C-alpha cells in the first residue's frame, strides 16, 4: 500500500523500536547540523575586530549560543572578547563542534541498531506478551532525566560550582564576559534581565520536575483520566510533546525579540526597542554631560565614549531594519564598519545648535530635518523641485565633529554638510567598507531577527500540529467509525469488531 507524503509517519505509530530509531536519526541530523554549521561559521568568521565587527554583524547563528554558555575561545588562538589564547582544549568552538559531529555519528549507529533490532522484549507486556508501552511510566522516566539535566545546569554550570558560568554583561553591552552567577531567590529573580534568575529558575524547575517524575513513576493515573486523555495512545504523546515545543518556541521568540539576560546584545545584537526608545542615545548624552560637569571640553567628553556604545546607537544594527527576504549578514548590507567618525553637531548662521531628526525603524526613506533644542525646524534637505526656504545653503548650516576619527574637525561646504546630515539620520556616524563583501547598501537583519522570525513561525505551525494530533487522538473512535451507540469497548486496530454486526449497541425504542 502506497502512502501519501503526509501519512508516512504511520509506519512507526505502533512500532516502538522503529519509533526510537527515527528519533535517534533525527537527533543525529540535528547534532550533525549543529557541529557542521559551527565549523562553517568558524571558517568564515573574522575575529579581528570584536567591537565594530562582532559575530552578530557577520551573521553568525550558532556561535552566539555557544558563547553565552561559556565557549569563547578558538583553536586558532583567538577569543571573541579580543584576547589571544593558547590551548583552549575541548571547551572551545572547534571542540564543541567536533563533539557534536562525533555524537551525531554515534546516534546514527544507534538508530541503525534500533531499526534492525526493533522487536525487543522491553516493548512487550510481560504478563500477556502483547506489544505494549507503559506511557505514563515512560513519561516519568523522561521527566526525571530532563529535570536532572535542568537542575544540574542551574546548580553547577551557571553558578560556576562545576562549570564556566554564563555570559554576563552590563545594561549597555560593553563589559561582557563569562562569569559565575549566584541564584536570585527573591522577587528580583523574576526580572528577565537579571541573570541570577536563570540559575534559580533552573534549580527550582529541576527540583519540581524531579519530584513530579518520581510521582509519575510511583502513582498510576486514575482509569477515568487514563481513558479520557487516551494515555495509552502514542499520538497523545506526540500531541502533548508538540504543545511543549510550541510553547517553548513562543517564549524564546519573546525573550530574543524583546531582549533578556539569556540573549545578550553583545552576542545577538541590540533589540529594535533600544533604537525606538533612544536607549543608547540617552546613555551617551548622560555620559557626555557627566564629563562636561567634571570640567572636560566637548571634544574630550565625546572622545571618552566607547566605540562599542556608539555603534549600538546606529540604525543599521536595528534587527527590524532588515527585510525578511534580504538574505545574508548585516555586513552584506551597509558594509563592514571600520571607524566611528564622531558625533556631528550642526549649527546655523544664527548660532542655533541643530540636531538631525532620526529615522523611525519602519521607514525606508525619511526627510532630512534639522531641529533646534525646542524642536523647531530650522533647516532641511528639500525634495527635488520643492520650494525651499530651509535648505542647508540658505540657512548656512555648518557641521562639527566631536570624538571619533574626525574629532574637532568642522565642515562648511554645503555638499559635505548634507552628506553628514544624511548619515546623522541613522544615529552615530560610521565609516563602512562596502567593497570587501560587495555590500549593496540595503540593511539586513541580525541573528536576533532571524531567530525570532523562525521560532515564531514554527511555533504557529506547531500550535496547529498540536490541535491536529490532539483532536485525532481524542476523537479517534469517531474518526474510525465507532459510533456513540456502541456500548462494547472497541478500539480501532486492536479488535476486528469495528462495524461488525455482533458488536453490542445501544438499542432505540
Swiss-Prot record:
GO cellular component, one term: chloroplast thylakoid membrane
Gene Ontology terms for molecular function: chlorophyll binding; electron transporter, transferring electrons within the cyclic electron transport pathway of photosynthesis activity
Predominant cellular place of this UniProt entry's protein: plastid
Keywords: Chlorophyll, Chloroplast, Chromophore, Membrane, Photosynthesis, Photosystem II, Plastid, Thylakoid, Transmembrane, Transmembrane helix
Co-factor note (free text): Binds multiple chlorophylls. PSII binds additional chlorophylls, carotenoids and specific lipids.
Localisation per UniProt entry: Plastid, Chloroplast thylakoid membrane
Entry function: One of the components of the core complex of photosystem II (PSII). It binds chlorophyll and helps catalyze the primary light-induced photochemical processes of PSII. PSII is a light-driven water:plastoquinone oxidoreductase, using light energy to abstract electrons from H(2)O, generating O(2) and a proton gradient subsequently used for ATP formation.
UniProt key word Plastid: yes
Transmembrane segments: 21-36, 101-115, 140-156, 203-218, 237-252, 457-472
Quaternary assembly: PSII is composed of 1 copy each of membrane proteins PsbA, PsbB, PsbC, PsbD, PsbE, PsbF, PsbH, PsbI, PsbJ, PsbK, PsbL, PsbM, PsbT, PsbY, PsbZ, Psb30/Ycf12, at least 3 peripheral proteins of the oxygen-evolving complex and a large number of cofactors. It forms dimeric complexes.
Family designation: Belongs to the PsbB/PsbC family. PsbB subfamily.
Name this protein carries in UniProt: Photosystem II CP47 reaction center protein
GO terms for biological process, alphabetical: photosynthetic electron transport in photosystem II
Gene name for this UniProt entry: psbB
InterPro entries on file: PS_antenna-like (IPR000932), PS_II_antenna-like_sf (IPR036001), PSII_PsbB (IPR017486)
Pfam family, any one: PSII
Membrane topology: Multi-pass membrane protein
